[in-house]
Amino acid sequence: MAVGKNKRLSKGKKGIKKRTVDPFTRKDEYSVKAPSTFANRDVGKTLVNRTSGLKNANDSLKGRIFEVSLADLQGDEDHAFRKVKLRVDEIQGKNCLTNFHGLDFTTDKLRSLVRKWQSLIEANVTVKTTDDYLLRLFAIAFTKRRPNQIKKTTYARSSQIRAIRKKMTEIMQREASSCSLAQLTSKLIPEVIGREIEKATQGIYPLQHVHIRKVKLLKSPKFDLGALLNLHGESTTDDKGQKVEREFKEQVLESV
């Protein structure tokens, strides 16, 4: 008989299953909060493994990026074609405080804008806000018919496209460089920059569907907790009572 391991002895009993542990028992739920520039601050919930040993739950949450529909943040279905990226910068209790990280259009909206018989004009610019956020803004615009136009096509000449693109970059540079990231977000929601471009280029060629279709965050400044808390409507300073000065009056006892 050959010397070796007896295979029949090493086999375990049939029917005994390995005990499975539910992974969700080791997880905690955190609320994701959007900055106060948006109407609805409750983004949703996120799960993370509970703090154990050297692994801290807060470190796992910081840096997470959430893509949310602007319609949910504003409570208005007219903004459904725009997506906002929010990045977790700080954890306060069970709340994840986020900051603006970017903006984009849905693919179906972009595809629906592109049509025949018109010119598509695109421009992008890299700009720094007053609070040192480096952003790249992408704009898109389409030509439209002039009043009382009989011709079917609305193609702009190359010289007109160059002039329109120059105006687009100038307006984006001016609007973004003169404000903070929070103020720029407030401009992007009602599409203030798009309307400015449409108004400024009216003399060159009439435009329609002028949008800032994408905002990309290239570089962030050094993290400032106070600025983030102010963005979320909170404060780091403690309310302290004022010192009240009173004149000392010696108490006179009438009876002993």
UniProtKB/Swiss-Prot annotation:
<dbReference type="GO" id="GO:0005576">
    <property type="term" value="C:extracellular region"/>
</dbReference>
<dbReference type="GO" id="GO:0022627">
    <property type="term" value="C:cytosolic small ribosomal subunit"/>
</dbReference>
<keyword id="KW-0689">Ribosomal protein</keyword>
<feature type="compositionally biased region" description="Basic residues">
    <location>
        <begin position="1"/>
        <end position="18"/>
    </location>
</feature>
<keyword id="KW-0963">Cytoplasm</keyword>
<dbReference type="InterPro" id="IPR027500">
    <property type="entry name" value="Ribosomal_eS1_euk"/>
</dbReference>
<feature type="region of interest" description="Disordered">
    <location>
        <begin position="1"/>
        <end position="20"/>
    </location>
</feature>
<protein>
    <recommendedName>
        <fullName>Small ribosomal subunit protein eS1</fullName>
    </recommendedName>
</protein>
<dbReference type="GO" id="GO:0006412">
    <property type="term" value="P:translation"/>
</dbReference>
<keyword id="KW-0007">Acetylation</keyword>
<feature type="modified residue" description="N-acetylalanine; partial">
    <location>
        <position position="2"/>
    </location>
</feature>
<dbReference type="InterPro" id="IPR001593">
    <property type="entry name" value="Ribosomal_eS1"/>
</dbReference>
<dbReference type="GO" id="GO:0003735">
    <property type="term" value="F:structural constituent of ribosome"/>
</dbReference>
<keyword id="KW-0687">Ribonucleoprotein</keyword>
<dbReference type="InterPro" id="IPR018281">
    <property type="entry name" value="Ribosomal_eS1_CS"/>
</dbReference>
<dbReference type="Pfam" id="PF01015">
    <property type="entry name" value="Ribosomal_S3Ae"/>
</dbReference>
<comment type="similarity">
    <text>Belongs to the eukaryotic ribosomal protein eS1 family.</text>
</comment>
<dbReference type="GO" id="GO:0005829">
    <property type="term" value="C:cytosol"/>
</dbReference>
<comment type="subunit">
    <text>Component of the small ribosomal subunit. Mature ribosomes consist of a small (40S) and a large (60S) subunit. The 40S subunit contains about 33 different proteins and 1 molecule of RNA (18S). The 60S subunit contains about 49 different proteins and 3 molecules of RNA (25S, 5.8S and 5S).</text>
</comment>
